[in-house]
Amino acid sequence: MQKIFLGRSIAERIDPDYERHGTTGIIASRNVATGEIVHPLIQPTRKEEDYLAHIDGVVSLHATHRHVFINDNLNNVFMKTLNTHKSESLVRFIAGIEGIDQSTLGVKDKSGILKNMKSRAEFLSDKSHQIVFVYTPKHCSWLNQIECWFSIITRRLLNKRSSFISLEELVMKISDFIHYYNQFLKKPFKWNYKGNLLRV
């Protein structure tokens, strides 16, 4: 959308007609201890291999640490219709890290751990693994801290008053915001709900 500045003492107006220059996606993780956005991928696709590249990038930063990735049951706000968080390639990646023989995983859509999304999710949620995926219940995306951060970037950068002249500018602004956030704004979220029942 193009902002129209009319001069002194006249309210800003936004032209309802706009030209769309393209879209992009963000795949990111948040370090809950520091608040840092870790290994963000800003690209037009959100495929299985993209999500796996993100997970691999996060894990390779601290290969000896235990990693917990939280995903909502719909996968992610940006990935609701995709199965990227329970994919065959992700199961094989985790099995490789855990030293599990690939031949014991079964065949996708037929047998073993790879039989269906439920069996893959159970494997990825195994708490004995060095990398664990937690799938929150439906309507609990507020528990997923990266979803809270997506709300921050939406309010501060990607709101309805935002205007970008090209896809390249959008990607640059998102990247700049992440860099600025990590440098000056990062901090752990402080949860303050006490667990008391709400009263009407």
Name each model-derived stretch.
Residues 1-200:
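Short functional hotspots at interaction and active-site rims
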